[in-house]
Amino acid sequence: GIELSTARYFTQATLAFMLVGYVVGIIAIPKYMTQATALKICSWLGIVFTIGAVLTSGFVSVAFIALLGLANSLMWPAIFPLAIDGLGKFTKIGSALLIMAIAGGAILPLVYGWLSELTSSQQAYWLMVPCYLFILFFAVKGHKIGKTA
């Protein structure tokens, strides 16, 4: 395994990567890229880093997990405005439903735990790939469904 003296810094690295993502988002959105573009980039990063975490081992695998902080940094700040855009008088209801949807995120850790017991904690990360693929779909096409140009 990885020495505790090294492993203890991975949480800090994850938070640092997330902070970098926040700062990039503050600087780049909307001046240099749209929220949809940021979400596309972060979705791809999530897919790549997750696959990297599963297919590598040791320090490199854990580093990919830490890099997920960067991939996840702009997810919610991009999903929320894209989802409520154009809702008009239903914006309050749409916002409330999005906030309640956070509870759905509480289900995946349970599924991950179950998969970890069946396979391994590393292989259970495959669960995240379809999630990131769905977010990518939302960034590319899903947020446009039902909206007029």
Q: What name fits each language-model region?
A:
Residues 21-34, 116:
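Helix-to-loop junctions at the C-terminal end of transmembrane segments
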Residues 37-52:
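Structural signature of the two symmetry-related core transmembrane helices
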Residues 73-88:
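Intracellular juxtamembrane helix-capping segments at the cytosolic ends
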Residues 129-149:
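Multi-pass alpha-helical transporter architecture, strongest
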